[in-house]
Design a protein with these regions (language model features):
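Conserved, well-structured ligand/cofactor-binding cores
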Residues: 2-540
């Protein structure tokens, strides 16, 4: 592509090179590839923003096409857009939004594949892929997403031109905007400033809808393991030091609930982005958008997306404030922070296998070292942490971008959309992968965990209500000093029998609210020692 021809005063278009056509915008003439469904303004955007080498998120592409379809339907209903043109725009949009039917729907009445139907599906898939491939604007682009909006306008206009030609209308040549105009027809009653934020919010809602079942898979995996590990007694740890016992199942149940609470907060945040500013046009005043159109386009979007969308209470506020996206990102950050904590816990509990905690074994999914034979690393947990670090970083980007708007518009929306959609995508994929390749295959090293717990000096804590803090502390110090267990020393001193200790230190006695043993046991205390009259608290 050459930008040299951009001359608005030039009276006649230059001759294009082979394989190109000439289009004109307010900056002048420009070559556009013959086979492109995009047009001159997209071509300028491609030329101006070769930043990341990536393209718009697929969810954002489908969302903006969905907005264009809803707008065309609304404009036809108000009588402003001729139905012949509007229907062509809607048909072009449907080619991009089309979803392949379920596999069973491709079978004929005899239960075998229908070649004609299969060929039709293949042709639709090919056309859909071709059209989506024409969305080329880098996520780091012109402020507010103008290039992305025009990319959608041009692709739909050029495809509508072809569809109308099949019906005998127009030349059918891409770039013949006298037939269907990207601005006057596809963008009718719209501005980038209401199209892009609406598209961004719908795409985010779509990906939240995808994330929820993935998160549920992860929650379910932890819940299953919590039941499986409910009888596995292990040492708790605070400050990275031995603490009172806990059941491994309790830890896994807490992980499941932690994730569920995060998902609930995300769903609450998602309600705020159900409010759409479509109809706001440029600055939120709704200039050039009829009230009837605004009501219809929101209704159409709700119908097309399946989301419970609503029009903004105040279009000016909804246009300049990015608070709803900030709330979604903050909820994602919260989930990510919790998942890092869980990941680090699992890595610690699985550390070793011979010189670490070794209380659990994570599934071996690939060799861990190119130099140390037989080494296996907690790669899924490591990957989870890295994904979450990215989400946390994306939230920082969104916070800065949300704060950077001026007056009636926040022009940083493209980076907000890009990072929010990336966060949802990688968290969704990671949740499924972590559930499948890690959590479901975790094994508890029961005997080893029990042995470590038995050697913990913190086992003096359930004895404190019977013995008092001072005597329990003395026993704990002796255990550490002599590298022996609390059980051994208590039995040696004759304070409790082995049988009493078996009941007193049973898993559920140690890991449920209340005093272990419920004061059912009487210790043999040193002569002259006065036992406590009730439970004695011991801080951690």
């Amino acid at each position: 592509m050459t930008q040299a021809a951009a001359n608005p005063a030039q009276a006649t278009p230059p001759t294009p090179r082979p394989g190109f056509r000439i289009e004109k915008d307010p900056l002048g003439y420009l070559e556009v590839p013959d086979g492109a469904y995009y047009g001159v303004q997209t071509a300028r955007g491609i030329h101006n923003f070769p930043i990341s080498g990536t393209r718009p998120h697929p969810a954002l592409v489908k969302a903006i096409v969905c907005v264009k379809k809803a707008a065309a339907r609304a404009n036809m209903a108000t009588g402003r857009l001729p139905k012949q043109l509007g229907n062509a725009i809607v048909e072009a949009a449907d080619e991009i939004l089309w979803s392949p039917p379920a596999r069973d729907d491709e079978l004929g009445s005899d239960g075998h594949s229908d070649p004609m139907r299969a060929g039709f599906q293949a042709a639709r898939l090919a056309k859909q892929a071709e059209l989506i491939d024409n969305f080329r604007i880098d996520p780091f682009q012109a402020g507010a997403g103008t290039s992305h909006n025009m990319n959608a306008n041009e692709v739909l206009a050029n495809r509508a031109i072809e569809l109308l030609h099949v019906s005998g209308v127009g030349s059918g040549k891409r770039g013949d905007y006298a037939v269907v105009s990207p601005n006057d027809h596809v963008n009718m009653a719209q501005s980038t400033n209401d199209v892009f934020p609406t598209s961004m919010r719908i795409a985010t809602l779509d990906l939240i809808r995808d994330f929820i079942p993935a998160a549920e898979e992860l929650i379910h995996a932890f819940e299953q393991k919590s039941r499986e590990f409910d009888d596995v007694l292990k040492s708790g740890r605070t400050h990275m030091q031995d603490a009172v016992p806990i059941r491994l199942g309790q830890e896994f149940a807490a992980y499941a609930l932690t994730i569920r609470r995060g998902v609930e907060r995300l769903q609450t945040a998602g309600q705020s982005i159900a409010e759409q500013n479509i109809g706001a046009t440029a600055v939120g005043t709704g200039l050039n958008a009829e009230p009837e159109y605004i009501e219809l386009v929101v209704r159409n979007l709700a119908e097309q997306t399946g989301h419970h969308l609503r029009g903004a209470e105040n279009l000016v506020q909804a246009t300049h404030s990015m608070r709803p996206m900030l709330e979604v990102s903050a909820a994602l950050r919260g989930i990510a922070v919790d998942l890092v904590k869980i990941s680090e816990d699992l890595r610690l509990m699985s550390s070793g296998p011979m010189t670490g905690f070794g209380e659990i074994t994570l599934p071996a999914v690939q060799p861990g070292s190119s130099i140390m034979p037989g080494k296996v690393n907690p790669v899924m947990a490591e990957c989870l942490s890295m994904v979450c670090f990215r989400v946390i970083g994306n939230d920082t980007t969104i916070a800065w971008a949300a704060s950077a708007g001026q007056l009636e518009l926040n022009v940083m929306m493209p980076v907000i959309a890009h990072t929010a959609l990336e966060s949802l995508t990688i968290l969704t994929n990671m949740s499924r992968a972590f559930a499948e390749f890690c959590v479901t295959g975790i094994e508890a090293n029961r005997e080893h965990a029990r042995d470590l717990m038995e050697r913990s000096s913190a086992l003096s804590t359930p004895l404190a209500p019977y013995l008092g803090y001072a005597l329990a502390a003395d026993i704990s110090k002796q255990a550490v000093r002599e590298n022996r267990t609390i059980r051994e020393i208590v039995i040696e001193r004759g304070i409790f029998s082995a049988e009493d200790l078996d009941q007193l230190l049973a898993p559920h006695e140690l890991t449920e609210p209340g005093v272990a043993g419920g004061f059912r046991f009487t210790p043999r205390l040193p002569e002259g020692y006065k036992p406590p009259t009730g439970p004695v608290g011991a801080g951690g």
